[in-house]
């Protein structure tokens, strides 16, 4: 299972469109907020894929998405959110505890506009960075194994 992970497009769709084009074989697309509705303009590129969109702190009056998404990917539970409600700019304890409540193996978040990935006791914490600057991530889940690539256009 290949997952395209983007965040923080803030109304800019040029790099978002390129990331979608480069990962046409992804089965899941996740937008972690602050521009989650930008995917609507590119619906033809997301057709046939599972799409998860989370509210960010800048989406509160623009979108009707959920604050977090919990979903399966090839038998692995994924916890996805923007991160602002878990104060990720100050640390990862709150978001780690939230993800572990759902027995997640992958925790995706945005908000900081900085790419980050780290394994913490079997939980992958991953921030794709800001797609507005060309940053995104691809996560691969196969037979319970998880790997990722942080990318830039």
Language-model features: where?
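N-terminal active-site segment of His-dependent metallophosphoesterases
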Residues: 1-49, 59-61, 66, 141-152
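Active-site neighborhood of phospho(di)ester-bond hydrolases with catalytic His/Asp-centered motifs
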Residues: 5-7, 28-34, 52-57, 79-82, ...
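Active-site environment of divalent metal-dependent phosphoester hydrolases
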Residues: 10-14, 36-40, 58-63, 86-91, ...
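Helix-adjacent hinge/juxtasegments
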Residues: 50-88
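Glycine-enriched alpha-helix->loop->beta-strand junction motifs that scaffold or abut catalytic
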Residues: 47-51, 122-124
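Short secondary-structure boundary/capping segments
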Residues: 43, 61, 68-71, 99, ...
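Binuclear metal-dependent phosphoesterase catalytic core
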Residues: 2-3, 17, 70-74, 100-103, ...
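Mid-chain, well-packed structural core segment of small domains
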Residues: 74-109
